[in-house]
Amino acid sequence: MFGIVSGLLSHPIAFFESSEALRQKRGLVTADGMGETFQTNVFGHYLLIARLTEAMAGGRVIWTGSAASQLQFKACDYQHVWGDKPYESSKYIVDQIAVPLDQRLRPFGVRCLVAEPGNVCTNFLAGLGLPLFEYLVVGVFYFIRFVLGIARFTINADSGAEGCCYAALADEECVDSRIKYHSQVTRTGKAYVGQFPLVQNKDTAAFLMGRLDGLVKRFDEPK
């Protein structure tokens, strides 16, 4: 609680733009022996792409990006099983592999892009069984967006989909795998697409592609 209050008082805009307030569990591993968040957000999709590449001609792979931090990524624990921020680490991996994966898929007529939906209010509070509280929280988010002008506070799903729709439907000459397409809104809720360069390290990208390809081979081996 102290961390939340401190974040709100010291850096309110950056606080709301991150997942700083979320508590994430360490040591979560799937039945396949992988970090749970890593397999959910990265490898499951990567494996699907690897197996369907030849059937995807003319299509696009749109990764959903989010808060990504190099500070949370460690090569020795690239699946971030034992770190504090597995979610941020998984999104950092997405940013790193987007360009080399796009280069690999292009000969098949497939593009690989990253879009970010911003902060969308989903049913994450539904488990509390307090619908009025949910409405209150959403109302507070609208108020904060209007007062502070936080462009990534898309709040509703339609506005949050703006970046993904652009990445999926824009003409070929209008998209670039080195760009992340952000869903953004004005204070009053008018949606638009912000374009920002991906922060990428080529050595890290090559390392991650090698690890992911190795995991794909492991899954393709006869049991």
Language-model segment annotations:
Residues 1-125:
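Rossmann-fold NAD(P)H-dependent dehydrogenase/reductase core
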Residues 66-223:
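NAD(P)H-dependent oxidoreductase Rossmann-fold/reductase module
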